[in-house]
């Protein structure tokens, strides 16, 4: 095979050859974004800014909206501490994912394929694909609800229309990865702005907010209903596909592939994801705060559905466009999640199976598998069934989480894989504690959901 043949992009469905095992993740965009090796800190941070914001999208999807709305409506500001705690856990795990990708030059899926036997990898791949479909399911539902609220499009029609976003992703990818990142960041700014306006109008008590965010209430664990919502918030926080995604897209930066260059890249990539996840913290906290002010404080504690919140926000907050801002933010969230789910699906399929397929085929396949259940359930059971399907998608994501968290913490703790860039023992111990907490709470959420507890 000539050099030209080896580097030329291929659009057909095929399994990569053995000679391509060392090919980087997302090789068409790997090392395509220049980074300065010196200069003012802001220029260097700006060069690395992007992957963290793409990852943060998964922390604001419709599954998070549902739990935050319910938490604020039922329990006021009390669960803000849980949102803060879950966000700190996410910051740690995403930093580890970035470290793995930069230190080894492999994404999490490639690292799993190299380490585990084939049967284990097959199980991991199936679990990942189910998680991608579940994530896409939430995005289809969220986008369809937003289209209905804004334009009156029926849920079934809105769900079918979401297939068109496949072409948006392809257009942006063809223009360059930086354009894709810019699109995501622009939509994040829209989401942030919508909730900043609503927070300003709601005017919550700052002292109470800060106290609830940093001082936990014993009621969180003594009140079964509150504990159930708290587990739901944590369970919906760390998206398993985000760990695969982040370990890959940090490699789009053309940092020096030396130990010094990698250490520098880890520092800036971690800074990028930490700032982006603080934005996600604001959005999730804002959803809960607005819900608490508009619903909990006005006797509407039973509000749990997104469309209920839309109907009540404007009259309760006294701002005519409050409901519109809410729906616009939901639409932006759904569109954004589309981009990251597409990339994660490509990374997982190439990493585990070495199967390379055209981006348009990957997108339409994943989105098609998500649209079908939404259309069928909506046709048979109406909008209530769609809401239950949204909850079910979060349960599927919870089931997949162990298959991403455990290998990640195992790999970044391994000096044979990471060399001098392996995490220190103290960080490893903390990571295992965080992993254990998330796994236990997710399994409890799964049990409670299946058996009707809470």
From Swiss-Prot:
Pfam families: Nramp. The keyword Cell inner membrane applies. GO terms for cellular component: plasma membrane. The chain crosses the membrane at residues 45-65, 78-98, 122-142, 153-173, 182-202, 220-240, 275-295, 312-332, 368-388, 389-409, 426-446. It comes from the Bacteria. Signal peptide: none annotated. GO terms for biological process: iron ion transmembrane transport. It is found in: Cell inner membrane. Residues 1-21 are annotated as: Disordered. One of its GO terms (molecular function) is cadmium ion transmembrane transporter activity. The keyword Methyltransferase does not apply. Keywords: Cell inner membrane, Cell membrane, Ion transport, Membrane, Symport, Transmembrane, Transmembrane helix, Transport. It is a multi-pass membrane protein. InterPro entries: NRAMP_fam. Its main location: membrane. H(+)-stimulated, divalent metal cation uptake system. Belongs to the NRAMP family. HAMAP family: NRAMP. This is Divalent metal cation transporter MntH.
